[in-house]
């Protein structure tokens, strides 16, 4: 379901997310966003989410994966920027910061299992 033959190198959490997303029947395609080359959210910082997902219903989801060691102000700023983008982009667009299961996510973020549950319904 990737848009391209080969995607850029991914870390373990990104790869896990992509494998789970690919298995969902309501996912039309996904794309690995190349930092500093592809899409970014422009705001008080430039934020390059990891993955763009399109559902069969046409919703666009941006997902940023984070390990527990990255619970910091930079991640909080990205959550705020992603939420602002989703509000401005309209009802067909969503943004999620996704932490691996077993980690307590930052406010405004979700775990991998929670994200996949939400994605199944979009």
Regions found by a protein language model. Give the residues of each.
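Electrostatic, structured charged patches in enzyme active sites and in nucleic-acid/phosphate-binding
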Residues: 1-122
